[in-house]
Amino acid sequence: MKFMKLGSKPDSFQSEGDNVRYVSSELATDVIVIIGDVKFYLHKFPLLSKSARLQKLITTSTSSSNEENQIHHHHHEDEIEIAEIPGGPASFEICAKFCYGMTVTLNAYNVVAARCAAEFLEMYETVEKGNLVYKIEVFLNSSILQSWKDSIIVLQTTRALSPYSEELKLTGRCLDSIASRASIDTSKVEWSYTYSKKKNLDNGLRKPQAVPRDWWVEDLCDLHIDLYKRALATIEARGNVSADVIGEALHAYAIKRIPGFSKSSSVQVTDFAKYRALADSIIELIPDEKRSVSSSFLTKLLRASIFLGCDEVAGLKNRVGERLDEANLGDVLLYDVELMQSLVEVFLKSRDPREDDVTAKASVAKLVDGYLAEKSRDSDNLPLQKFLSLAEMVSSFPRQSHDGVYRAIDMFLKEHPEMNKSEKKRICRLMDCRKLSAEACAHAVQNERLPMRVVVQVLFFEQVRANNNGSSSTGNSTPEVIPASRSTNTTDQEDTECWDTEDIKALRGELANLRLAKNQQESHNQGKLMKGGGLGVSRVFSKLWSGKERSGDMISSSGTSSPGSVNDDSKSSSSTSKKH
């Protein structure tokens, strides 16, 4: 930190209690200056030689008030009461010591107060050459404002000294100094700065690191929001800093200034009005460029803004929804279901209908699946209808697998054991059994929470997969009878049908044999077993479904649908779900 020492005489100011200051001298004091609740017992001559304002006050023989300063004669001492002086007693003492020629040290923390007080006391060059105003200006221009961190400290102090600091343009000069350095080419940054992000090493070797583009953002986080807004506006006005760096600055500021911003749970806030205004200001400062801030930052800011009751929530909600495909599950878990639905709606509206953005939709589908799985643990706040409403919004979105859908359904069934068969049927329509991974299938076939019809479907498609993967023939090894995964004509009566437990066990046994044969890696015997297993499973399925045929419940290999075209069932599922 830069500093400047003024004067050479030893400091002879003494204290008597908390409210009395005097100069230890052989000469009796002849003037009392009252600043606030502190009395200074001083000598006229040193003060008169450097302060035009004190000259006027002391030489005035009347008791008239001049800008709320009054003079009284008291025991051969003039008593001057100064109602207000920038910086209070501390800054006046600096000026008084300068008048006496005593040693006083100026630095970034007290220089603005001293400058404002010197201006108030009219300590100009016209009164005496080399006066305090001149010396402080030299110190500011040649030292303080040439230092990155000192400029920030000084800017902080200007707020408590407004409007004096504004009238003397001290605030503006600090802002210009900060903006000029933040906007400079990073290759010319030679001063120290705070940067806590991990710096990558080039090729694993320890080399001098290039200065990052956002090197300045953390140092500005200590600024009050009013000054921070002005600093950012001044930096942006120079046009040399990109929008994404401004976004990084806002992110760093939010993390430091908004309680619990980066935490996964709400925190207790005592001053809602303060932090509400802070969050609103940050939202207003976000650049218009879409990628100027990360999606994670937006989702966290939306969460905080809703919690604080901010005014700018609507606009922020749109920005989050438009980029919902970039959101992380951890960032949205504190959102309620209604908010998630509105974000998905914004996402859908923001998509160009002429473009099929498969990747973005798949990301949103994965996000919603994970959200529903986690939210299902909170059974009180996620009833079936809300679950279905949100899930159906993304039911048509592309997915590589339906494992996420299955996990969400299973978690919901686990937390809602009171569900009846009709409700279970509705929720299970969201899942396409053909798109479950082998691991999900293995879990599903043992899952007693699923309706038996769904278990049968999973068993069947798992058998088809195992049969096709393991068969040595190039022909169609799909069984002749396929139960529809999503039938439009199923009824509650079907759910009450008594499935033969022995048949289900037989299916599971056949599948176990298929897996075992595959793992043995004996192609000749494996081929025989796989073929035999496939036929065995087909016979079990035929037995299982015989006598229970319904319209749309069976698809024959010679019918209109084939094992690879169960998409028709998916479409009918969509129309069915709308009926509920």
From Swiss-Prot:
Composition bias type Low complexity, residue spans? 468-478, 553-580
Describe the location of the NPH3 domain by residue ranges.
214-465
Q: What is its main location?
A: membrane
Where on the tree of life does the source sit, at the highest rank? Eukaryota
Q: Which InterPro entries match?
A: BTB/POZ_dom, NPH3/RPT2-like, NPH3_dom, SKP1/BTB/POZ_sf
Region described as Disordered: 468-497, 548-580
Ranges for domain BTB come to 29-108
Record's keyword terms, sorted? Cell membrane, Cytoplasm, Membrane, Phosphoprotein, Ubl conjugation pathway
Phenotype seen when the gene is deleted: Lost basipetal PIN1 polarization, resulting in abnormal auxin accumulation all over the meristem surface as a result of the lack of an auxin sink. Plants missing NPY1/MAB4 and NPY5/MEL1 form pin-like inflorescences with several leaves and sterile flowers. Triple mutants missing NPY1/MAB4, NPY3/MEL2 and NPY5/MEL1 are sterile and have altered PIN1 localization in organs primordia (e.g.
Record keywords: Ribonucleoprotein included?
Answer: no
- Give the UniProt subcellular location, in the record's own words: Cell membrane; Cytoplasm, Cytosol
From the UniProt record, give the pathway where this protein acts.
Answer: Protein modification; protein ubiquitination
Write out the transmembrane intervals: none
Please name the PROSITE patterns in this protein's record. BTB, NPH3
* Coiled coil, from the record: none
Please provide an example of a Pfam family that matches this protein in its UniProt record. BTB
Q: Which GO terms describe its cellular component?
A: apical plasma membrane; cell periphery; cytoplasm; cytosol; plasma membrane
A GO biological process held by the record:
positive gravitropism
UniProt comment concerning the protein's domains: The BTB/POZ domain mediates the interaction with some component of ubiquitin ligase complexes.
Subunit organization: Component of a complex made of PINs (e.g. PIN1 and PIN2), MAB4/MELs (e.g. NPY1/MAB4 and NPY5/MEL1) and AGC kinases (e.g. D6PK and PID) at the plasma membrane. Binds directly to D6PK, PID, PIN1 and PIN2.
Q: What is this protein called?
A: Phototropic-responsive NPH3 family protein NPY5
